[in-house]
């Protein structure tokens, strides 16, 4: 059986996922498209899914009997509405981050999924599928001993004028918030944000770089450098210091050169190139589970925890270096 997918939101990531499903992965095809700008949906249909129908109403797409599962790739403010509609229709749903723009909205999705009695939602935290992070998690389990500290960095070449200080948390750090919690299998209990001297490349309304310090329930201390105007490349670093050793995220594969008395290796400039395989792996996981009428991978609960943690980090940006508590309710049995 070929799984029929409906894609809501055909901007850059929606079009890329449509291409991925129809041209790279097996067992599914994109059967329906929707975008607030119909021209985007028509372009996606023309370039990647000529047999797909275009829906002007996203809710009609979700309800359609010829659509088996949903991809929500639209503007973040709409995610909660469409994910809740997919749950109500009993259809597996892959939602790009954020699951919702507020912790309260993410909690409503968790509650709806609990009421449905089974997992239907996968959140697009693709780093869990990156081979480097998978190997790092294995090293933590088998080599380093219990984690003590984590040093991490998320560096972008540059950002636009519309990128503001809180976006360093909600748009950038959010990936570390999820993947570090997954690596450590530990929840956060507190967050602090420190601001070093401001980079002259940062625009007036952006404080950059930032250092976010997270503490976990087991006492692990994590420092994450967020530097979104580093200019030299897209650079993701992660080092876990354990009781018995240290494990470090490997660099992306690249040709090493020796020339002119210089040992060199290129640094990627684009996040899509850094994690291109991870997107294939995460969607393949979703399609495999959706064919069984369920969901796999990062859960709605993971999306909720990320939202609560991000809110605390944004509050910590205004707390003058003081720690802000991160408080979570008990994890529902559905996500145990």
UniProtKB/Swiss-Prot annotation:
Per the UniProt record, which EC number(s) apply here? 1.1.1.18
Give this protein's Gene Ontology molecular function annotations. inositol 2-dehydrogenase (NAD+) activity; nucleotide binding
* Catalysis performed (reactions): myo-inositol + NAD(+) = scyllo-inosose + NADH + H(+)
Please cite one Gene Ontology biological process associated with this protein: inositol catabolic process
Q: InterPro entries, per this entry? A: Gfo-Idh-MocA_inositol_DH (IPR050424), Gfo/Idh/MocA-like_OxRdtase_C (IPR004104), Gfo/Idh/MocA-like_OxRdtase_N (IPR000683), MI/DCI_dehydrogenase (IPR023794), NAD(P)-bd_dom_sf (IPR036291)
Q: Does the keyword Cytoplasm apply?
A: no
Q: Name one Pfam family in it.
A: GFO_IDH_MocA_C
Q: Does the keyword Cytoplasm apply?
A: no
Task: Supply the alphabetized keyword list.
Answer: NAD, Oxidoreductase
Top enzyme class, one word, equals: oxidoreductase
Q: What family classification does the UniProt entry report for this protein?
A: Belongs to the Gfo/Idh/MocA family.
Instruction: Provide the function of this protein.
Output: Involved in the oxidation of myo-inositol (MI) to 2-keto-myo-inositol (2KMI or 2-inosose).
Q: How does it assemble?
A: Homotetramer.
Instruction: From the Swiss-Prot or TrEMBL record, give the protein name.
Output: Inositol 2-dehydrogenase
- Name of the gene encoding the protein in the UniProt record: iolG
């Amino acid at each position: 059986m070929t799984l029929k997918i409906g894609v809501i939101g055909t901007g850059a990531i929606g079009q890329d996922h449509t291409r991925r499903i129809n041209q790279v992965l097996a067992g599914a095809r994109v059967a329906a498209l929707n975008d607030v700008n119909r021209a985007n949906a028509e372009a996606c249909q023309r370039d990647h899914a000529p047999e797909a129908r275009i829906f002007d109403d996203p809710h009609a797409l979700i309800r359609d009997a010829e659509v088996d599962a949903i991809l929500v790739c639209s503007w973040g403010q709409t995610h909660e509405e469409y994910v809740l509609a997919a749950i109500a229709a009993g259809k597996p749903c892959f939602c790009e981050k954020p699951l919702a723009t507020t912790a309260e909205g993410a909690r409503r999705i968790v509650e709806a999924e609990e009421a449905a009695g089974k997992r239907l939602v996968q959140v697009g935290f693709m780093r869990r599928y990156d081979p480097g992070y998978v190997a790092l998690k294995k090293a933590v389990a088998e080599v380093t001993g219990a984690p003590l500290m984590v040093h991490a960095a998320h560096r972008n070449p540059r950002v636009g004028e519309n990128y503001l200080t809180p976006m360093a948390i909600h748009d950038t750090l959010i990936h570390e918030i999820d993947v570090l919690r997954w690596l450590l299998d530990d929840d956060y209990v507190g967050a602090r944000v420190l601001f070093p001297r401001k980079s002259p490349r940062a625009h007036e309304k952006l404080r950059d770089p930032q250092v976010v310090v997270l503490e976990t329930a087991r006492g692990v201390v994590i420092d994450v450098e967020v530097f979104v105007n580093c200019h030299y490349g897209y650079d993701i670093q992660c080092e876990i210091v354990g009781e018995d050793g240290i494990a470090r995220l490997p660099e992306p594969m690249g040709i090493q050169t020796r020339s002119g008395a210089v040992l060199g290796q290129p640094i990627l400039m684009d996040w899509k190139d850094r994690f291109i395989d991870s997107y294939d792996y995460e969607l393949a996981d979703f399609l495999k589970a959706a064919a069984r009428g369920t969901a796999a991978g990062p859960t709605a609960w993971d999306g909720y925890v990320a939202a609560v943690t991000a809110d605390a980090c944004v509050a910590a940006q205004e707390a003058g270096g003081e720690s802000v508590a991160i408080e979570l309710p008990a994890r529902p049995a559905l996500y145990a």
